[in-house]
Amino acid sequence: MSRLIDEIKKYKEAFKIKAPQEVQDKMLEATKKLEDSSISKHALTVGFQAKDFNLSNAIGNEVSLSKTLEENDFAVVSFYRGVWCAYCNFELKALQGINEELKQLGAKLIAISPQSPDASMTTKEKNELEFEVLSDNENKIAKEYGLVFSLAEELRPIYLSFGIDIPASNKDDSYEIPMPATYVINKNKEIIFSFIDEDYTKRCEPQDILEAIKKNS
């Protein structure tokens, strides 16, 4: 069992112990509704051309997919919900764990969320990330990738009770967030690997990313 799966399993077990059952039931029901809606069917996946982007990083410098692919053989793009999401933090730390190997394979790692640059900086510092963390204002790029949905209204007060204020984090009152997704994109901007799941507790295994790149090198 990988370290990422281990971390997620441990966190979920702890959450089941401490969270009220009513809260757990509402969260599970919302995830089930999202899965039943099959919104992931509308997302870009393997074989599609990746949408270009030009987004600000945590210190305000712009990073583009085109420029990244001019300088690297592959781009690994991870869409995440925000620093407030424990599962996202587990995943980002796991990605940091393979960052050096990705560089050796000619791949550049980029993470994207709808958070403001300040929140992106918090993400970068909290998780000690050495790769780019970009701000996708109003989920403009995530929408082009077909990943965006609105957080269920019944979950909003629950999230606030956890101290999670999505509008404040995103500087946007829409409550729109992306499904977590991971893409490996080659020099031709073709998506050669993708992981997308409506269940935000399920995340891409870092080893799968490495294997996809090695297979296409």
Regions found by a protein language model. Name each.
Residues 66-95:
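Short active-site neighborhood of thiol/selenol oxidoreductases, capturing the structured segment around
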Residues 33-44, 49-52, 165-183:
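Alpha-helix-centered segments that form part of catalytic cores
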Residues 91-144:
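Structural microenvironment flanking redox-active thiols in thiol-disulfide oxidoreductases
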Residues 198-216:
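A short, polar/charged loop-to-alpha-helix boundary motif
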Residues 136-202:
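Thiol/selenol-based redox catalytic cores and closely related redox-interacting motifs
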Residues 38, 132-134, 140, 212-217:
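Non-catalytic interaction/Regulatory regions outside core domains
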Residues 59-60, 188:
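Residue-level recognition of short loop/turn positions
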